[in-house]
Amino acid sequence: MQRILMAPGQSCCALAILLAIVNFQHGGCIHVTSSASQKGGRLDLTCTLWHKKDEAEGLILFWCKDNPWNCSPETNLEQLRVKRDPETDGITEKSSQLVFTIEQATPSDSGTYQCCARSQKPEIYIHGHFLSVLVTGNHTEIRQRQRSHPDFSHINGTLSSGFLQVKAWGMLVTSLVALQALYTL
């Protein structure tokens, strides 16, 4: 058996790298999908939250309209508090759905709708794609689009590509500092 001996300073550097990697993994597999369906004048906006059993605790799923900068449970159209299902294991992905229904769509229902999820423990904020709804007379047009503004990724705690980029850069910088410390010892 081969043993690797490290100087006291080197073990701290190795610990810093390990902590950065563990922190980068945080966030699990929680994600949001949204869709829309129409029957006559009725419009159903469906938000689906995919999560594992232990990730459900404290999650709130909600719909917002024309409010991309302040979409929160306090400013929502409708919300659902996700409950932990004791019947499921911690491995299987489970879905929770929130359907926002507009019984008879009118031009005042036109706008940009977004489904989001938020948790307090740990602080997680996930926002889904936008659904653009345009109601003119008897015609309703629905389009799904990606987030178009890059600043969405700067919202504190947001699990988005911007959030993961910040985490990756943090891990890279921490690793480089640790390697430099190892090199100077």
Curated annotation (Swiss-Prot):
Observed phenotype of the null mutant: No visible phenotype.
Entry-listed glycosylation sites: N138, N156
Residues anchoring lipid (GPI-anchor amidated serine): S160
Gene Ontology cellular component annotations, sorted alphabetically: extracellular region; plasma membrane; side of membrane
Signal peptide stretch: 1-27
Assembly information from the UniProt record: Homomultimer; disulfide-linked. Interacts with classical and non-classical MHC class I molecules. Interacts with TNFRSF14 (via cysteine-rich domain 1); this interaction is direct. Interacts with LCK and CD247/CD3 zeta chain.
Descriptive protein name: CD160 antigen
Organism: Mus musculus (Mouse)
